[in-house]
A protein has these predicted regions:
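Helix-to-loop junctions at the C-terminal end of transmembrane segments
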Residues: 156-170
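C-terminal transmembrane helical hairpin of 12-TM major facilitator-type secondary transporters
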Residues: 171-214
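Cytoplasmic helix-loop-helix junction between adjacent transmembrane helices
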Residues: 1-34
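A membrane-interface helix-boundary motif in multi-pass transporters
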Residues: 48-61, 251-277
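Helix-loop-helix hairpin linking two adjacent transmembrane segments in secondary transporters
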Residues: 29-72
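Juxtamembrane intracellular "pre-TM" segments in multi-pass secondary transporters
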Residues: 75-112, 133-134
Length: 295
């Protein structure tokens, strides 16, 4: 119910950014998530020694500070005359999802988002299981690996993206990011030594180029006063993939790691994700080559 922060942040970025800067600015959201993955476990682990509930109190305090800052300090992104009036009929998940049908120009990219986010659950849903099963890691090493990936995400989306997208453009950056992501997923599927996790995390993290580039292309083709609703539709779409993705990836991992399976292959979810992402890349290339989108 309270999961609209990312949607609102994305809409805010779209409102205040010029078309040329949208993709780079969307990358800042990814960079913030990366820093969160680094700092969050450290803070939580430190506070946890004072009681299992203390990290939750701290998280509530941070959220409250965020609320105060947003309400009293952060300026409104649109002038009053440019805002659309509130309509209760459109303020529901189904209506928001159905609102995406008003944007046929970007349907191909929406398919790409669905495929890409299903593929992401190869790591979101099975990461701990994968590294523990495949490399015999303990909780500490799992945490280190997540922190390392968070650091790479912050570097890519907070820094590299500001160099690469202006130089290559959003479309080529999208293709480049998806290619790196596919390569990273495939490499993880065949990884059999612990050090490979840190090496293969580099191309996987460079895949972070594609998300902001994709967001930048789509938002450039949406009216300014519909950015919030559009971002809500995207979030609803991603939420649906968060139902399907974990079911597929966790069951696949179980099938290829339990004693009854004919083949032992803990990297199976990553291989499937590489195939799904390849389909997403094919869809994106074919669609963008035929469309007249503003990029």
């Amino acid at each position: 119910i309270m999961g609209a922060s990312l949607t609102t942040a994305s809409a805010y970025i779209a409102d205040i950014s010029t078309p040329e800067k949208k993709a780079q600015n969307f990358g800042l959201i990814g960079a913030a998530f990366g820093l969160g993955f680094i700092l969050g476990p450290v803070i939580g682990g430190f506070l946890g020694q004072y009681g299992s509930r203390v990290p939750f109190y701290a998280a509530s305090l941070f959220t409250f500070i965020n609320l105060i800052y947003g309400y009293f300090v952060l300026p409104e992104s649109l002038k009053k005359e440019n805002r659309r009036s509130f309509d209760i009929k459109r303020a529901n998940p189904i209506g928001t999802l159905l609102s995406l049908k008003r944007y046929p120009l970007i349907w191909g990219l929406l398919i790409c988002i669905v495929l890409f986010n299903i593929a992401q659950h190869s790591k979101h849903s099975t990461w701990s299981f994968f590294v523990i099963e495949n490399f015999g890691w303990d909780e500490k090493l799992v945490g280190y690996s997540l922190g390392f990936i968070g650091l790479l995400a912050a570097i890519v989306q907070g820094g590299l993206i500001r160099l690469i997208i202006p130089k290559l453009g959003k479309v080529k950056s999208l293709y480049l990011g998806m290619t790196f992501y596919i390569a990273g997923l495939f490499l993880f599927s065949i990884a059999d030594k612990g050090w490979m996790v840190f090496a293969f995390a580099i191309p996987l993290s460079l895949g972070g180029l594609c998300g902001p580039a994709l967001q930048g292309i789509m938002t450039n083709n949406i009216p300014d006063n519909e950015q919030g609703e559009f971002q809500g539709g995207i979030t609803s779409l991603i939420s649906l993939t968060s139902i399907v993705g974990p079911l597929i990836m966790t069951n696949l991992f179980y099938f290829f790691t339990n004693n009854k399976g004919a083949i032992y292959f803990p990297g199976a979810p990553f291989l499937l994700a590489a195939i799904i992402s390849t389909l997403g890349l094919i869809v994106a290339v074919n669609f963008l080559n035929k469309s007249n989108l503003k990029t």
